[in-house]
């Protein structure tokens, strides 16, 4: 709840002192990029969706009181219902608000600079409160873990990769490249150091009715912080676009999917290496066998 209030306060501050009164020019912020321009020239509302964690209340007989719990293994409605069914005597109820990951504060600060540069506003929503109909008629930027995708898992269902979440913010990503199956693992060993090898994806996808979707997803905080920072800084975004054009016949596509390995110490990663890239066609949803529309 405190984090929710913090982000709400942050957005009100941004709206009042930056959107309405600030002379900010965004010199270090992308303001002439194919990646971002589509979000500001189609006349649709922009929504930033944060992948939040499910919270529930449970009565603890030993303590004699109700506890508020966030369990990393109980994060979807199906997982929650299964937990209730297997523990009928624990008096379990879902809390109406989710817990926001700490990285979301960094992400909002970075993203708002882009919106300031384009002089556009955005709305903040949470993955726990929306369904797939939410993507209709609006642009969406999702930032969160694979674990917190919920309805947005439909958006990446036909992308050319597979992912598996593992305990402790680890996971696997597999894709085919040059006729070979490649599997990468997000890993950290905090018994040795705070060094993290995280994995994440950036997917910019077209909607069926001129919407635009940008999904920045990782297994841990590191990938989300680093990839958002990379997209919101003019120099690093230009470097990424140059790298993409190098592997895409000199062109920067409107839509694409990419996998990144992110390296560095906990919440302070310094390196993002693109491991896989593929252009996404403008008729992406025509290939979707169970269309969300």
Model-derived features: positions:
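Solvent-exposed alpha-helical segments and adjacent loops
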Residues: 20-293
